Amino acid sequence: MTAEPTVAARPQQIDALRTLIRLGSLHTPMVVRTAATLRLVDHILAGARTVKALAARTDTRPEALLRLIRHLVAIGLLEEDAPGEFVPTEVGELLADDHPAAQRAWHDLTQAVARADISFTRLPDAIRTGRPTYESIYGKPFYEDLAGRPDLRASFDSLLACDQDVAFDAPAAAYDWTNVRHVLDVGGGKGGFAAAIARRAPHVSATVLEMAGTVDTARSYLKDEGLSDRVDVVEGDFFEPLPRKADAIILSFVLLNWPDHDAVRILTRCAEALEPGGRILIHERDDLHENSFNEQFTELDLRMLVFLGGALRTREKWDGLAASAGLVVEEVRQLPSPTIPYDLSLLVLAPAATGA
């Protein structure tokens, strides 16, 4: 039996209990996501500051909306500026649609990522089986679901591109393109990374390899950017031989979607398509050590498990994957972001025979 706590020990146990309840809460994350989905902060900033006005704007029941708003005040996202009138706090302002941090879309339950986060409700299944849970909720694997839902596909591409600096500009600036003639961006989305390279290095041409559902979006984006003469888009499958050789092959937020054996298959295809002296550039999150318990790293790692069966990799894991594909990690460059609370990395891989 556990001994009865002393009077002196009880406050510490109460604090521990409060911490556990906060960490285990499902209602607070759903309240925040509901506020994002309803665009409450945008409506407030547009002048709808009362429950009645907000209910009219959001097509919700005033009495139910008030209960939501009361919790938003309790957790510090809203405050009562005058009796019955609410305004966002500094934290709440992050849920404005035009905020540079772009958090409203990430928390909107109708958008691709927040919708997929519902997969976490079946996390025990993923831990028992090592397999994703997304399909058990939505009936199709993640990318197959996106392919059949153009709205979700557009949402996903937009979310990945929402931080222009960390998504494209920072990695494009981190590499010397002097000796690169052609870049192949494998799984390159709408072409933002390839476009950033093309703008920075006018002598470089590029090819974006993507699935059918994204090809038209990428072509339209590159045309609007005035780069369609230098960056072409090809429909294809990166498990098959790649459509052409290149001096630099980019994998930006691709391998984290796949378990190790599939990641090795993708890397092997990329290695086959390298021109002599070429390099593979992997743009993702990595962690220095196996025993690093970084909250953002572990959270995204679990998200990849329940969405796709993929994983984030530590430095040791990257070395192992590279070796399995006949490659070596030549260098790693950290890419700090001004708008997200963690750094990303650009890993440079070379054929093992030439790598350092």
Swiss-Prot record:
Q: Where are the transmembrane segments?
A: none
What is any Pfam family matched here?
Answer: Dimerisation
Binding, S-adenosyl-L-methionine: R153, G187, E210, D237, F238, S252
Q: Identify the coding gene.
A: dnrK
Mention one GO molecular function: O-methyltransferase activity
Its annotated function is as follows:
Involved in the biosynthesis of the anthracyclines carminomycin and daunorubicin (daunomycin) which are aromatic polyketide antibiotics that exhibit high cytotoxicity and are widely applied in the chemotherapy of a variety of cancers. In vivo, catalyzes the transfer of a methyl group from S-adenosyl-L-methionine to the 4-O-position of carminomycin to form daunorubicin. In vitro, it also methylates the anthracyclines rhodomycin D (10-carbomethoxy-13-deoxycarminomycin) and 13-deoxy-carminomycin at the 4-hydroxyl position.
Q: Which GO terms describe its biological process?
A: daunorubicin biosynthetic process; methylation
Reaction(s) catalysed (UniProt annotation): carminomycin + S-adenosyl-L-methionine = daunorubicin + S-adenosyl-L-homocysteine + H(+)
Membership in a protein family = Belongs to the class I-like SAM-binding methyltransferase superfamily. Cation-independent O-methyltransferase family.
EC top class, as a word: transferase
Q: Which organism is it from?
A: Streptomyces peucetius
According to UniProt, the name of this protein is Carminomycin 4-O-methyltransferase DnrK
Give the domain of life.
Bacteria
InterPro entries with a match to the protein in the record: COMT-like, O_MeTrfase_dom, Plant_O-MeTrfase_dimerisation, SAM-dependent_MTases_sf, WH-like_DNA-bd_sf, WH_DNA-bd_sf
Annotated keywords: Antibiotic biosynthesis, Methyltransferase, S-adenosyl-L-methionine, Transferase
Q: In which pathway does it act?
A: Antibiotic biosynthesis; daunorubicin biosynthesis; Antibiotic biosynthesis; carminomycin biosynthesis
Listed under subunit, the entry gives: Homodimer and homotetramer in equilibrium.
Instruction: Please tell me where substrate binds in this chain.
Output: D163, N257, R303
- Provide the E.C. number(s) assigned to this enzyme: 2.1.1.292
